[in-house]
Amino acid sequence: MEDFVRQCFNPMIVELAEKAMKEYGENPKIETNKFAAICTHLEVCFMYSDFHFIDERGESIIVESGDPNALLKHRFEIIEGRDRTMAWTVVNSICNTTGVEKPKFLPDLYDYKENRFIEIGVTRREVHIYYLEKANKIKSEKTHIHIFSFTGEEMATKADYTLDEESRARIKTRLFTIRQEMASRGLWDSFVSPREAKRQLKKDLKSQEPCAGLPTKVSHRTSPALKTLEPMWMDSNRTAALRASFLKCQKK
């Protein structure tokens, strides 16, 4: 599973996931299912915010150009992917500026158009069950919840899905593709079932060819959202080294 994750996701997402796990004392090489889940969640958060801006009239617009108009403002503030100290600094700044209620738990995004924090969920189970778990944990009507599944289902607070249908379809397609890639390599069952995961871990530890037989379909285009985060945690030399290592692995 670890090798699959490194092949399937953008190297910068993988690096962020590793940093997040190590911050909590977790090992990506051992807790590989969690590693995959964190990478998936990060990618969904970045895809959620990609290309969405607010124009000078306060209207939400979609711009896919690499050099948007200077008058445009990013619609979403990305909180997920930052270390806890920086994340809370961002949250406190938003609350002080906008007057919104400070959440008890770190949310994933802030929507400047709707003036609300957003909690993103990606589940391998029924969306309504995971939604209720999130709602019971957060216990706040101020934080908007949006849940996606690997089967194309979604659920959001008051059926308000925030994004346009096409943007949500991109996320659903990506999740479905991840599921299909896992299933084709016998990894999906272990991703869903903890018991199967233990068996798969033993199998993974015996593997001698980390790059063999793994998918190579990964986007080399850096997400606009990732570009805004990159200066905070990675310089250009580290980025180049990661990408060089990734391409070398592909050629084997």
UniProtKB/Swiss-Prot annotation:
Site feature: Important for efficient shutoff activity: 202-203, 206
Residues carrying the site annotation Important for efficient shutoff activity and nuclear localization: 195, 198-199
Major subcellular location class: host cell
Database matches in InterPro entries: PA/PA-X, PA/PA-X_sf
Keywords associated with the record: Decay of host mRNAs by virus, Eukaryotic host gene expression shutoff by virus, Host cytoplasm, Host gene expression shutoff by virus, Host mRNA suppression by virus, Host nucleus, Host-virus interaction
Role of this protein: Plays a major role in the shutoff of the host protein expression by cleaving mRNAs probably via an endonuclease activity. This host shutoff allows the virus to escape from the host antiviral response. Hijacks host RNA splicing machinery to selectively target host RNAs containing introns for destruction. This may explain the preferential degradation of RNAs that have undergone co- or post-transcriptional processing.
Domain notes: The probable endonuclease active site in the N-terminus and the basic amino acid cluster in the C-terminus are important for the shutoff activity. The C-terminus acts as a nuclear localization signal. The C-terminus is recruited to host protein complexes involved in nuclear Pol II RNA processing.
Protein family: Belongs to the influenza viruses PA-X family.
Name of this chain's protein: Protein PA-X
Species of origin: Influenza A virus (strain A/Swine/Hong Kong/126/1982 H3N2)
